[in-house]
Amino acid sequence: MASLLKSLALFKKNKDKPPLAAGSGGAIRGIKHVIIVPIPGDSSITTRSRLLDCLVKMVGDPDISGPKLTGALISILSLFVESPGQLIQRITDDPDISIKLVEVIQSDKTQSGLTFASRGASMDDEADRYFTYDEPNGGEERQSYWFENREIQDIEVQDPEGFNMILATILAQIWILLAKAVTTPDTAADSELRRWVKYTQQRRVIGEFRLDKGWLDTVRNRIAEDLSLRRFMVALILDIKRTPGNKPRIAEMICDIDTYIVEAGLASFILTIKFGIETMYPALGLHEFAGELSTIESLMNLYQQMGELAPYMVILENSIQNKFSAGAYPLLWSYAMGVGVELESSMGGLNFGRSYFDPAYFRLGQEMVRRSAGKVSSNLASELGITEEEAKLVSEIAAYTGDDRNSRTSGPKQTQVSFLRTDQGGEIQHNASKKDEARVLQVRKETWASSRSDRYKEDTDNEAVSPSVKTLIDVDTTPEADTDPLGNKKSAEALLKLQAMASILEDPTLGNDSPRTYNDKDLLS
């Protein structure tokens, strides 16, 4: 048996192992298409600023071709470094495209004020054809997307500080698009706006230079459909991270935006580890989880073997991403989602409408959190040097704060999970209903006895008083038994509950309501 378990462990390890580079053949190259990337041919700020202005207008052209749009975006993304050409040549290794760098310089003979640098021949006509477009015939107005503020016609500046701020503003909006462009492009607008507000408040960007929605939609769609552009952006992020010492301000901003980009599309895997394993609840000892725990272990080892590209596997369309799908560990994922919903309010809006979602294990995760609330892990307590008295004190405080939190919490979290029931709970619900009926009968007897004793004690009253009113206790006129304000508050709440219960018992429709039935499929969507 020991050898079988050892062989099983080796099998799981080799099964999820990525293929090694071997054989006599080299890298497989596809049919490449040429991407023209204009770069500044001198160190003048005017040249860079004028080039940025032309590129922004090119991207906003609705009729721009895909390869030309990719080249313009690569040029914009690399304008913040001192030598954009060297950067592009160093980090670009794409089997699908061939990048052709073209230097641009200032010129007074072209419409754009720029021309392609050459040693002899004039390239003014070629520069005009590249940077400008023909106006449509018939007097039709071309719709171009630039900035939300239509008063901004150009962004050409002369000083380096102003250029860096404008460039940082444009780059921030482009990099923010990468976070959701691949996974959820249709619902990305809200999160992108929150990121923009954050950097505006931090004075990293200029709020007046907010790009138009149509411009952003064009770039988002291009990022989603062009793998080569995403490869360049990921390579640029990794190159910035490897740079030692202090980095330029724009580079630091890109690294900050990268925190929203990494692990995009890997939420199921990351959340399963966070809520299912790191919480270390005893439910992990179930036999049902044994196989999936070994699967998660193999995936974690595979994630580490992939190195620095692992967090970007979905963005880079790596085929190995399918191994990390929640369908490979459905029971553990369902359990982890139940734990997460109870621990974090932000998990309440998560969509659980998956074919492999298991409500029973989801509820198992919920119950583990609820029943383990306030308990201290003995292993962790021993590592931290926590005594038994301190652990008991922590448990009491945690239980009190948990009750206070539950009393204030309302809404989505409980409404999403209260319907999750299994067929095994039928007997429990039946026993609970019997207990409820017995409790109702007992309360009715006590209420009847109380109302009967009140009749002997009350004075003659000409007004007709209903029996339900006689059983109600006036909290305001009840004499105080002690001077403890907390005790008085609890007593008042208890009396109010008794009043509400008495009113319910007098309701003739009591007991006629049929239990409400929920449709799991409808509520999960």
UniProtKB/Swiss-Prot annotation:
Q: What does the protein in this record do?
A: Forms the helical nucleocapsid (NC) in a ratio of 1 N per 6 ribonucleotides, protecting the genome from nucleases. The nucleocapsid (NC) has a helical structure with either 12.35 or 11.64 N per turn, approximately 20 nm in diameter, with a hollow central cavity approximately 5 nm in diameter. The encapsidated genomic RNA serves as template for transcription and replication; encapsidation by N is coupled to RNA synthesis. Forms the encapsidation complex with the phosphoprotein protein P. Before encapsidation, the newly synthesized free N protein, so-called N0, is chaperoned by P.
Q: Which sites bind RNA?
A: K180, R195, Q202, Y260, N351
| Membrane-traversing stretches | none
Source gene? Answer: N
* Interaction with the phosphoprotein: region residues: 477-505
The entry's free-text remark on domains says: Ncore is globular and carries regions required for N self-assembly and RNA-binding. Ntail is an intrinsically disordered monomeric domain in the C-terminus.
Region: Disordered; residue ranges are 449-489, 504-525
Q: List the disulfide bonds.
A: none
**What's an example of a GO molecular-function annotation for this chain?**
structural molecule activity
Q: Taxonomic classification, please?
A: Viruses, Riboviria, Orthornavirae, Negarnaviricota, Haploviricotina
Instruction: List, alphabetically, the GO terms of the cellular component aspect.
Output: helical viral capsid; host cell cytoplasm; ribonucleoprotein complex; viral nucleocapsid
Q: Where is the composition biased (Basic and acidic residues)?
A: 449-459
Q: What is this protein called?
A: Nucleoprotein
Protein family (similarity comment): Belongs to the paramyxoviruses nucleocapsid family.
